[in-house]
Amino acid sequence: MQYLTLNDGNKMPILGYGVYQVEPAEAQRCVEDAIGVGYRLIDTAQAYYNEEGVGAAVKTAIAGGVKREELFITTKLWISDVSEERALKAFDASMKKLGLDYLDLYLIHQPYSDTYGAWRAMSRLKKKGGGVASAVSALATLMRVKLWILR
Protein backbone atom coordinates (compact mmCIF):
# COMPACT_ATOMS: atom_id res chain seq x y z
CA MET A 1 0.00 0.00 0.00
CA GLN A 2 1.31 3.44 -0.87
CA TYR A 3 0.70 6.41 1.40
CA LEU A 4 0.58 10.17 1.21
CA THR A 5 2.03 12.10 4.14
CA LEU A 6 -0.36 14.82 5.32
CA ASN A 7 0.76 18.21 6.68
CA ASP A 8 0.33 16.95 10.25
CA GLY A 9 2.66 13.98 9.60
CA ASN A 10 -0.03 11.31 9.48
CA LYS A 11 0.02 8.90 6.58
CA MET A 12 -3.06 8.38 4.42
CA PRO A 13 -3.42 5.50 1.95
CA ILE A 14 -3.56 6.85 -1.61
CA LEU A 15 -6.29 4.39 -2.55
CA GLY A 16 -9.54 4.22 -0.63
CA TYR A 17 -13.05 2.84 -0.67
CA GLY A 18 -15.89 5.36 -0.73
CA VAL A 19 -19.47 4.65 0.24
CA TYR A 20 -21.21 7.46 -1.65
CA GLN A 21 -24.60 6.17 -2.82
CA VAL A 22 -24.19 2.90 -0.89
CA GLU A 23 -27.48 2.16 0.83
CA PRO A 24 -27.21 2.32 4.63
CA ALA A 25 -28.33 -1.32 4.89
CA GLU A 26 -25.53 -2.40 2.52
CA ALA A 27 -22.73 -0.21 3.86
CA GLN A 28 -21.53 -2.64 6.53
CA ARG A 29 -21.20 -5.57 4.14
CA CYS A 30 -19.55 -3.45 1.44
CA VAL A 31 -16.99 -1.99 3.83
CA GLU A 32 -16.29 -5.39 5.40
CA ASP A 33 -15.60 -6.74 1.91
CA ALA A 34 -13.41 -3.73 1.06
CA ILE A 35 -11.33 -4.15 4.22
CA GLY A 36 -11.17 -7.89 3.55
CA VAL A 37 -9.52 -7.34 0.17
CA GLY A 38 -7.04 -4.82 1.56
CA TYR A 39 -8.56 -1.36 1.50
CA ARG A 40 -7.50 0.64 4.53
CA LEU A 41 -8.92 4.09 3.73
CA ILE A 42 -12.69 4.22 4.09
CA ASP A 43 -14.51 7.40 3.06
CA THR A 44 -18.03 8.26 4.20
CA ALA A 45 -19.97 11.44 4.92
CA GLN A 46 -22.74 12.76 7.10
CA ALA A 47 -24.84 13.28 3.94
CA TYR A 48 -24.45 9.65 2.82
CA TYR A 49 -26.47 8.40 5.83
CA ASN A 50 -24.33 5.29 6.16
CA GLU A 51 -21.82 6.16 8.88
CA GLU A 52 -23.34 3.55 11.21
CA GLY A 53 -22.71 0.77 8.69
CA VAL A 54 -19.14 1.95 8.21
CA GLY A 55 -18.60 1.96 11.97
CA ALA A 56 -20.06 -1.54 12.33
CA ALA A 57 -17.74 -2.81 9.59
CA VAL A 58 -14.73 -1.24 11.30
CA LYS A 59 -15.70 -2.94 14.58
CA THR A 60 -16.03 -6.27 12.77
CA ALA A 61 -12.63 -5.83 11.13
CA ILE A 62 -11.00 -4.99 14.46
CA ALA A 63 -12.64 -8.01 16.09
CA GLY A 64 -11.18 -10.07 13.24
CA GLY A 65 -7.63 -8.89 13.90
CA VAL A 66 -7.23 -5.70 11.87
CA LYS A 67 -5.63 -3.00 14.02
CA ARG A 68 -7.48 0.32 14.20
CA GLU A 69 -4.18 2.08 13.48
CA GLU A 70 -4.07 0.34 10.09
CA LEU A 71 -7.36 1.93 9.06
CA PHE A 72 -7.84 5.50 7.89
CA ILE A 73 -11.43 6.61 8.36
CA THR A 74 -12.71 9.85 6.93
CA THR A 75 -16.12 11.50 7.07
CA LYS A 76 -17.42 14.85 5.97
CA LEU A 77 -19.35 17.75 7.47
CA TRP A 78 -22.44 18.57 5.42
CA ILE A 79 -23.27 22.12 4.32
CA SER A 80 -26.18 22.49 6.75
CA ASP A 81 -23.67 22.28 9.63
CA VAL A 82 -20.94 24.57 8.30
CA SER A 83 -20.47 26.88 11.28
CA GLU A 84 -18.31 26.63 14.37
CA GLU A 85 -20.91 25.37 16.85
CA ARG A 86 -22.89 23.21 14.42
CA ALA A 87 -19.68 21.61 13.16
CA LEU A 88 -18.75 20.54 16.69
CA LYS A 89 -22.20 19.00 17.23
CA ALA A 90 -22.13 17.30 13.83
CA PHE A 91 -18.69 15.86 14.60
CA ASP A 92 -19.98 14.38 17.85
CA ALA A 93 -22.99 12.92 16.02
CA SER A 94 -20.76 11.37 13.36
CA MET A 95 -18.45 9.90 15.99
CA LYS A 96 -21.43 8.37 17.78
CA LYS A 97 -22.72 6.85 14.53
CA LEU A 98 -19.27 5.57 13.59
CA GLY A 99 -18.61 4.29 17.12
CA LEU A 100 -14.95 5.26 16.90
CA ASP A 101 -12.53 6.63 19.49
CA TYR A 102 -10.93 8.88 16.90
CA LEU A 103 -11.33 9.95 13.30
CA ASP A 104 -8.42 10.20 10.90
CA LEU A 105 -9.76 12.93 8.61
CA TYR A 106 -12.75 15.26 8.89
CA LEU A 107 -13.61 17.17 5.73
CA ILE A 108 -15.82 20.16 5.11
CA HIS A 109 -17.82 18.59 2.29
CA GLN A 110 -18.44 21.84 0.41
CA PRO A 111 -17.40 25.39 1.30
CA TYR A 112 -20.78 27.04 1.84
CA SER A 113 -21.97 29.21 4.69
CA ASP A 114 -19.53 29.82 7.56
CA THR A 115 -16.53 27.86 6.27
CA TYR A 116 -14.16 29.81 8.51
CA GLY A 117 -16.24 28.98 11.58
CA ALA A 118 -16.25 25.30 10.65
CA TRP A 119 -12.48 25.47 10.16
CA ARG A 120 -12.10 26.97 13.65
CA ALA A 121 -14.19 24.08 15.00
CA MET A 122 -11.90 21.60 13.29
CA SER A 123 -8.86 23.32 14.78
CA ARG A 124 -10.48 23.02 18.22
CA LEU A 125 -11.11 19.31 17.61
CA LYS A 126 -7.49 18.78 16.60
CA LYS A 127 -6.21 20.56 19.73
CA LYS A 128 -8.64 18.61 21.93
CA GLY A 129 -7.25 15.31 20.68
CA GLY A 130 -8.86 12.48 18.84
CA GLY A 131 -6.34 12.51 16.02
CA VAL A 132 -8.43 14.61 13.65
CA ALA A 133 -6.79 15.98 10.54
CA SER A 134 -8.99 18.46 8.72
CA ALA A 135 -9.38 19.61 5.15
CA VAL A 136 -11.91 20.99 2.74
CA SER A 137 -13.05 19.29 -0.45
CA ALA A 138 -14.26 21.24 -3.50
CA LEU A 139 -12.56 24.44 -2.38
CA ALA A 140 -11.35 27.39 -4.42
CA THR A 141 -7.65 28.29 -4.24
CA LEU A 142 -8.22 31.71 -2.65
CA MET A 143 -10.16 30.19 0.24
CA ARG A 144 -7.44 27.54 0.71
CA VAL A 145 -4.88 30.31 1.11
CA LYS A 146 -7.07 32.11 3.65
CA LEU A 147 -7.62 28.91 5.65
CA TRP A 148 -3.88 28.18 5.55
CA ILE A 149 -3.24 31.59 7.11
CA LEU A 150 -5.85 30.92 9.83
CA ARG A 151 -4.36 27.61 10.92
Predicted regions mapped to residue ranges:
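A cross-family glycoside hydrolase active-site/sugar-binding cleft signature
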Residues: 18-20, 45, 74-76, 106-109, ...
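N-terminal binding-site loop/beta-alpha segment at the start of enzyme catalytic domains
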Residues: 1-71, 101, 127-129
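Glycine/proline-rich, positively charged
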Residues: 82-151
